[in-house]
């Protein structure tokens, strides 16, 4: 059975998109899933840095090999984090990032689905051709928003586009742990503003004060037993979200 592509996206930077991608990877890892994280935040990718991965290959090198008939195996371009999680890193050089063409994205995802149970794609917050292609080829897209008026207004615009194009394969997560001082809008107000439901909420209690320590150590939060115990409610919520994102029910719903 082919793996499922789950893209993680937003309409504003700094909303916790990369951390959420890594947390999902940790949950799938604990479930025994083989996971590939593809960093397609091409100009500001943070996956390899967050995991302390010293990658020698990246997605640009893979695409360059494809374009010049040198490509043979996806594994030649991924870097292993642990026994269940591999990473296809973003380019280190922004000049190379500019050369990544959207037409190669479906090919990369097809190769990845053959090798992995779950393919997590960390995107940028810019709705460009590459991100639109990723969403088109995703089994599900997780959209992340915060209690921020600019963020919510932009999310409203994206949701409107999805509805106009009859796109249904997405869930929306409200991340209250990112800016704990922002509580301007109630959940009802947020739903009204974006014109859609909030499927999952990460509470402000999940704010990790010493998160820099975990980043320095290259840790995934959901693989840390102490964090999982102390923040059990939010972790359980993320586990439910992770299972929902790969649930076969979306096929039955025409997603």
Residue locations for each model-derived region?
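Beta-strand-loop-alpha "switch" segments that mediate conformational coupling across diverse proteins
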Residues: 178, 190-222
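Phosphate-binding loop that captures ATP/GTP phosphates
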Residues: 28-87
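Well-ordered beta-strand positions
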Residues: 118, 140, 196-200
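Acidic-aromatic/histidine active-site loop/patch
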Residues: 1-5, 160-165, 169-170, 215, ...
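C-terminal structural cap/anchor segments
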Residues: 138-192
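Walker A (P-loop) phosphate-binding motif
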Residues: 1-35
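Inter-motif core of Ras-like GTPase G domains
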Residues: 111, 126-148
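Cytosolic-facing regulatory segments adjacent to core modules
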Residues: 66-130
């Amino acid at each position: 059975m082919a793996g499922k592509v789950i893209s993680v996206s937003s309409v504003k930077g700094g909303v916790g998109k990369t951390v959420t991608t890594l947390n999902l990877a940790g949950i799938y890892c604990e479930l025994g899933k083989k996971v590939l994280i593809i960093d397609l935040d091409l100009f500001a990718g943070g996956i390899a840095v967050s995991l302390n991965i010293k990658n020698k290959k990246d997605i640009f090198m893979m695409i360059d090999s494809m374009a010049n008939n040198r490509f043979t195996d996806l594994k030649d371009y991924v870097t292993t984090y642990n026994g269940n999680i591999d990473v296809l890193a973003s380019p280190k050089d922004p000049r190379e990032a500019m050369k990544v063409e959207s037409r190669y994205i479906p090919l990369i995802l097809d190769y990845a689905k053959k090798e992995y149970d779950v393919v997590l794609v960390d995107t940028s917050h810019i709705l460009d051709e590459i991100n639109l292609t990723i969403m088109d080829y995703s089994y599900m897209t997780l959209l992340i928003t915060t209690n921020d008026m600019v963020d919510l207004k932009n999310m409203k615009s994206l949701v409107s586009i999805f509805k106009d194009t009859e796109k249904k394969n997405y869930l929306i997560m409200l991340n209250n742990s990112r800016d704990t001082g922002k509580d301007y809008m109630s959940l009802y107000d947020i739903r009204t503003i974006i014109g859609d439901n909030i499927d999952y909420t990460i509470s402000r209690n999940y704010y990790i004060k010493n998160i820099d320590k975990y980043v320095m150590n290259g840790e995934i939060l959901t693989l840390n037993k102490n964090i999982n115990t102390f923040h059990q409610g939010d972790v359980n919520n993320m586990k439910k979200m992770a299972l929902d994102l790969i649930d076969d029910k979306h096929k039955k719903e025409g997603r």
